């Protein structure tokens, strides 16, 4: 099993996901809301992606079926946890880690389940982020 190749692909996935967080940042600018939570989330996810990718960027071996299955499993867990960061950083939600990961995993799996009691009161960039997770997952 080539763990370096798996780590490299995980880094690429995180780098791509971090770029999608720029969309809610743009929405926050448009609506005049704070970008701090999303900007911090972007930076965390982007730099973790860089840390996973760059040490392994010269790895060129073929991915076998076993590694492909592991990459898909890691994909779901990693994106669910890193997708929870904006929910954790939003002070209006007061989410625990479990609630934030549940909300993120719900978006990635497009189940539509939520722990938010009044979705209409969320700020617009966070609403956009929730829908973006569902779009990316679907």
Label every PLM stretch briefly.
Residues 1-138:
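Membrane-proximal intracellular helices of multi-pass ion channels
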